[in-house]
Each structure stands twice: as C-alpha cells, then as structure tokens.
C-alpha cells in the first residue's frame, strides 16, 4: 500500500505545475490549502456516509478519492509519505498498531526509536462497542 501512496505522491508533485485547465491536481494547488482541505473533508464525509449505509463498493471508491485528496494536501503542506510512516512507526512502537495516541501523549518528544520487540498485540475492532463522545 505504501508503494501506491508513494507513487501517487510523486504523481501529485509532478502534476502540481501543469495547466489548471486540464489538471485537477494543478487546479487544487492553484486554489490553495483551504480548497484542498474542503475537498478532503467532503471525501471523508462521503466515506462515512457510504460506510454507515453499508455500501462497501462506494466506500472503496470514495476512500481512493480521500487518499488522493489527502496526498494533495500533504504535498501542499510539505509533508512526505515517509514522514507519516515514521509517525505511524513511532505510535506502533508505543501502543501497538491498532491504537491511536491519547491527546496527552501527543506532546511526547519525538524519538528515533528502534522497533520494539515487545509490542501490544494487534486487536480486532469488530468486537468493540461504539462510545458516544460528549
């Protein structure tokens, strides 16, 4: 998967200076980060709606659009895919692959940590119950 996102990222970088009249990517770069963010949010909402409606095929299609728009926003912000992979590795080393860092842990110093042998196990998400946020 990361190879596909790497290729997409490189294609986005190559397309950003094309003619906005013929390139959707160039048009997004021309319109700036706020338009990119709006498109990303729209795609995220579409993924959520399709998932709630149980439309798996639509979730797949909209997820591809979501990843495209995320990659465009990364490129605009100067974020490279390997920056994200490095953060994911750091989090995995701390908590396991299927966990999100709590907000209090976000302020921990960045450490170039080697892969930790004793990680938390990967957990199945199907058995978890949804909690309502307040």
Swiss-Prot record:
Q: In which pathway does it act?
A: Amino-acid biosynthesis; L-histidine biosynthesis; L-histidine from 5-phospho-alpha-D-ribose 1-diphosphate: step 2/9
Which reaction equation describes what this protein catalyses?
Answer: 1-(5-phospho-beta-D-ribosyl)-ATP + H2O = 1-(5-phospho-beta-D-ribosyl)-5'-AMP + diphosphate + H(+)
Give the Enzyme Commission number: 3.6.1.31
Kindly state a single biological-process term from the GO annotations of this entry. L-histidine biosynthetic process
Grouped into one coarse class, the protein's main location is: cytoplasm
The cellular location(s) given in this protein's UniProt record come to:
Cytoplasm
Task: Give the source's domain of life in one word.
Answer: Bacteria
Q: Which UniProt keywords apply?
A: Amino-acid biosynthesis, ATP-binding, Cytoplasm, Histidine biosynthesis, Hydrolase, Nucleotide-binding
Task: Output the Gene Ontology terms for molecular function.
Answer: ATP binding; phosphoribosyl-ATP diphosphatase activity
Query: What CDD domains does this protein map onto?
Result: NTP-PPase_HisIE_like (cd11534)
EC top class named in words: hydrolase
Cellular component annotations (GO), alphabetically ordered = cytoplasm
The similarity comment for this entry is: Belongs to the PRA-PH family.
HAMAP family in alphabetical order? HisE
Q: What is this protein called?
A: Phosphoribosyl-ATP pyrophosphatase 2
Natural source organism:
Bradyrhizobium diazoefficiens (strain JCM 10833 / BCRC 13528 / IAM 13628 / NBRC 14792 / USDA 110)
Task: Give the classification, highest ranks.
Answer: Bacteria, Pseudomonadati, Pseudomonadota, Alphaproteobacteria, Hyphomicrobiales
The gene is hisE2
């Amino acid at each position: 998967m990361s190879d596909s996102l790497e290729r997409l990222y490189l294609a986005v970088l190559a397309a950003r200076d094309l003619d906005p009249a013929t390139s959707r990517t160039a048009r997004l770069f021309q319109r700036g980060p706020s338009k990119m963010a709006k498109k990303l949010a729209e795609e995220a909402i579409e993924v959520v709606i399709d998932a709630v409606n149980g439309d798996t095929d639509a979730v797949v299609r909209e997820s591809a659009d979501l990843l495209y728009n995320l990659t465009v926003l990364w490129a605009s912000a100067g974020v490279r895919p390997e920056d994200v992979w490095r953060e994911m590795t750091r989090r995995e080393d701390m908590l396991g692959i299927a966990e999100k860092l709590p907000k209090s842990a976000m302020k921990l110093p960045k450490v170039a940590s080697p892969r930790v042998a004793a990680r938390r196990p990967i957990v199945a998400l199907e058995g978890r119950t949804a909690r309502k946020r307040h």
